[in-house]
Design a protein with these regions (language model features):
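Glycine-rich active-site loop/strand segments that organize a redox cofactor
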Residues: 62-98
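Glycine-rich loop(s) and the adjacent beta-strand/alpha-helix scaffold that form part
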Residues: 198-255, 395, 399-408
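An anion/pyrophosphate-binding glycine-rich loop and adjacent beta-alpha core
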Residues: 230, 236-352, 408, 414
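Glycine- and aromatic-enriched mobile tails/lids
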Residues: 2-8, 12-14, 36, 47-49, ...
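Conserved redox-cofactor binding core of oxidoreductases
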Residues: 50, 105-192, 199-210, 245-254, ...
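Glycine-rich FAD pyrophosphate-binding loop
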Residues: 35-56
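Core beta-strand elements of the Rossmann-like FAD/NAD(P) dinucleotide-binding domain
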Residues: 12-15, 184-195, 378
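N-terminal Rossmann-like FAD-binding beta1-loop-alpha1 element of flavoenzymes
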Residues: 17-42
């Protein structure tokens, strides 16, 4: 047993609005709730200064700016969302949580000390991913996350760093609070709140990584579905959980950079030096991400690999800007490319398809807690924002939608006259469950357990899937249930990893079940059913909603979505 356990304390905490997850969406939610005059508590598994998907920085913000062209308007943007994220994006929600909040989000970014402009004072915009015009504002967001952390501290938000949330509790069907523990000291927290915003991102480490290391991923490896699982167990409805997302990355280095490359005009070519994306989408290298991945997979499957990012036609100034931008998300990516022999001039950079992850099928929606126009779930008092929700993704939605979630959570909290009770017996049971892996002298390590989950997911639905592969995955994943009670941990760090592994396991089952129920292919290859290879708008243009009922049964339904065309 870890030596710190003998000093473990139990803390009782009360607040108006609790924010679970201190990434971009969570911190913007906290700003809004504090601005509304609520007591705000931020709980983060890491440290809010550098945590979440943009912990290392970010270089793009999607926005329409109303500069004059027909594509640069609210209406054109929503039309674009409807085309590119058809069947996954609820335009009514987007209109409320993004469009209504966009101007304020842009102003807030500048106000906290991060300029969206280039050194010459101009806004530089690029076009990629199926956009009708250059919606990407290219900027230096290296210090955006620390600046947001400073802002929530300035607004007097209470912060609990290094606390992993373990479960959510209701009282008479409404939020009562949640539990968690300090991943360093083992202190246990019982937290009561009038409202909570869940902003803990998507689920990673579910599939085999491109380079073998499950922590060297395109996306944040600390996002392990912790609150997707906890919310699901509390009866919160989830949506868009069936999608398996991938991107194009440098061979040997999973890193962001897709839109930087294509926004600057780079193009994908096969080993015959042929640009191939024109064969898969009319916009060629400006196509939506899923088409780019689909095209790359087909070229590799048909023997025309490896694939390359062709930058030979870019001008010296464009290359200089590109390599600077690539270092904003991950400092070492430019160094890696140069060390591999890719000179800045005349570069032909070998690329590949990244590892899959359970996440949104488009930059224009999310995957997770089903939200309405108020960012509210089906459970009173529980709200969601960012990648943890079914309608938000990327910086633009995390900034705008995160703030919207905080506003609505605060408005709800102000109507609640008293905190709801946490059941004493349930608290004791949860504390015992959380620390039980530390008491086991022998058993399974988190690495062994998690690796088995990854193998099953990769083999059965990462990304090609059929009814047989999905039912087989569920059978194998269900057989792992008994092994959950055998996980052991030798210290607090391993305890955290054990709970992450357990959450990844549960989310993998949720994802497989949702994919099984969607008997069509959509956003190829993110939901590619080899037994149903066509998109079926007549029957499946909508959100696959999955929910655990009070009796423990898991149910699904399709919430149909309507679009102008």
């Amino acid at each position: 047993m870890d030596g710190a356990m003998s000093d473990r304390k139990v803390h009782e905490v009360e607040t108006d609005v609790a924010i679970i997850g201190g990434g971009t969406a969570g911190l913007n939610s906290a700003m809004a709730a504090a601005e509304a005059g609520c007591r705000v508590l931020i709980v983060d598994k890491a440290n809010i200064v550098h945590s979440g998907a943009i912990a290392g920085g970010i270089d793009h913000f999607v926005a329409y700016l109303g500069t004059g062209p027909s594509w640069d308007t609210r209406e054109a943007y929503l039309g674009y969302v409807g085309r590119v994220a058809r069947g996954a994006a609820d335009l009514d929600v987007h209109d409320a949580v993004y469009c209504d909040e966009l101007d304020a989000a842009l102003a807030r970014t500048e106000k906290i000390g991060v300029s969206l402009r280039q050194p010459d004072g101009k806004i530089f915009r690029t076009q990629a991913m199926g956009q009708p015009g250059p919606y990407f504002i290219n900027f230096d967001g290296k210090h955006l996350k620390p600046k947001m952390a400073m802002e929530v501290k300035r607004r007097k938000c209470e912060i609990l760093n290094r606390v992993q949330v373990t479960n959510i509790y209701l009282h008479d069907g409404e939020l009562a609070g949640f539990t968690g523990y300090d991943i360093r000291t083992g202190d246990f927290y019982r937290i009561r709140a009038k409202a909570v915003v869940i902003a803990t991102g998507n689920t990673n480490r579910m599939f085999n990584a491109q380079i073998g290391n499950p922590f060297n991923l395109w996306y944040c490896p600390a996002n392990t579905g912790d609150l997707h699982r906890a919310a699901f167990d509390a009866g919160v409805a989830l949506a868009n959980m069936e999608y398996v997302r991938m991107t194009i990355v440098p061979k040997g280095f999973s890193a962001p950079g897709f839109n930087a490359f294509f926004g600057m005009g780079a193009r994908l070519v096969n080993s015959l030096r042929e640009p191939f994306m024109k064969n898969y989408h009319e916009m060629a290298d400006k196509a939506p991400r899923n088409f780019m991945v689909w095209g790359a997979l087909q070229e590799l499957k048909e023997g025309r690999g490896p694939i390359y990012m062709d930058c030979r036609h870019l001008k010296p100034k464009e290359l200089e800007h590109l390599f600077f931008t690539l270092g904003i998300d991950k400092d070492t990516l430019p160094e890696f490319l140069l060390a591999k022999g890719y000179a800045k001039e005349g570069a032909m950079i070998e690329m590949t398809v990244s590892e899959p992850m359970q996440a949104r099928p488009s930059e224009l929606c999310g995957s997770g807690i089903r939200i309405d126009r108020n960012c509210a779930s089906n459970v009173p008092g529980i709200y969601a924002a960012g990648d943890a929700s079914d309608q938000m993704g990327c910086l633009h939605m995390a900034m705008a939608g995160g703030f919207a979630a905080g506003k609505h959570a605060a408005a709800y909290a102000k109507k609640i006259t008293h905190l709801r009770p946490l059941d004493t017996h349930a608290m004791a049971e949860e504390e015992a469950r959380v620390f039980r892996p530390l008491e086991r002298r022998s058993g399974i390590t988190y690495r062994e357990f998690e690796n088995i989950v990854r193998i099953i997911c990769t083999d059965h639905f990462g990304p090609v899937k059929t009814e047989l592969s999905l039912t087989g995955a569920l059978e194998k994943l269900n057989r792992l249930d008994t092994a959950r009670d055998e996980l052991k941990a030798d210290n607090m760090h391993e305890l955290m990893r054990a709970h992450e592994a357990l959450n990844i396991h549960q989310v993998s089952k949720i994802s497989a079940r949702a994919a099984l129920e969607r008997r069509e292919s959509r956003f190829h290859p993110y939901q590619y059913r080899a037994d149903f290879p066509q998109t079926d708008d007549a029957n499946y243009c909508g959100l696959m909603v999955i929910q655990k009922q009070p009796d423990g049964a898991v149910t699904t339904r399709l919430d149909k979505l309507k679009y102008a065309a």
